[in-house]
């Protein structure tokens, strides 16, 4: 595949597994979610566009960047997970969608946190980890304008602060 980068993939898997083993907080975005799925034993749809039951999740490169990163579909949050704890008053919200691959099989080590209307996994967390969250969308885009994105980043920052404080106590 033209976009394949085996060296990057190996490095990503090593970093993810080291962070999981050391219980270091992870906030995996877009490809990061896909790498988290694979690192924990899951698999991917290599080309979502070849799955007729799924929505179009790729961006249109002909559009201005602002439109490419604009919200394009809703996600439904699963109850009882990390995402619902971070967003207790929010069971569904709109996200942008700029990916050609997506989770096919999710490892038993992961918990599905959110899905798009077509059933595709849009967010996962690692079970029994203080904060290892992967999202398929790009919350970093215009995050200063979206309270939901800020809440996710603040949750990650808080988890990092707790991790550092815990290490200092040891």
What are these regions (language model features)?
Residues 109, 127-132:
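Beta-strand-turn-beta hairpins that frame and shape the catalytic cleft
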Residues 3, 41-122, 158-159:
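Pocket-forming structural segment of enzyme catalytic cores
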């Amino acid at each position: 595949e033209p976009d394949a980068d085996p060296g990057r993939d190996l490095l990503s898997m090593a970093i993810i597994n080291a962070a999981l083993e050391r219980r270091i907080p992870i906030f995996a975005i877009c490809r990061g979610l896909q790498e988290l799925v694979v690192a924990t034993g899951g698999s991917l749809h290599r080309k979502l566009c070849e799955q007729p039951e799924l929505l179009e999740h790729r961006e249109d490169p002909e559009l201005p960047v602002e439109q490419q990163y604009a919200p394009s579909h809703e996600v439904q949050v699963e109850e009882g997970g990390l995402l619902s704890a971070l967003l207790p008053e929010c069971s569904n919200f709109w996200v942008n969608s700029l990916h050609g691959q997506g989770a096919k099989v999710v490892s038993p080590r992961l918990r599905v946190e959110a899905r798009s209307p077509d059933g595709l996994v849009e967010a996962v967390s690692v079970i029994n980890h203080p904060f290892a969250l992967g999202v398929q969308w790009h919350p970093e885009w215009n995050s200063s304008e979206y309270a939901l994105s800020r809440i996710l980043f603040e949750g990650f920052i808080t988890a990092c602060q707790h991790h550092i404080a815990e290490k200092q106590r040891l």
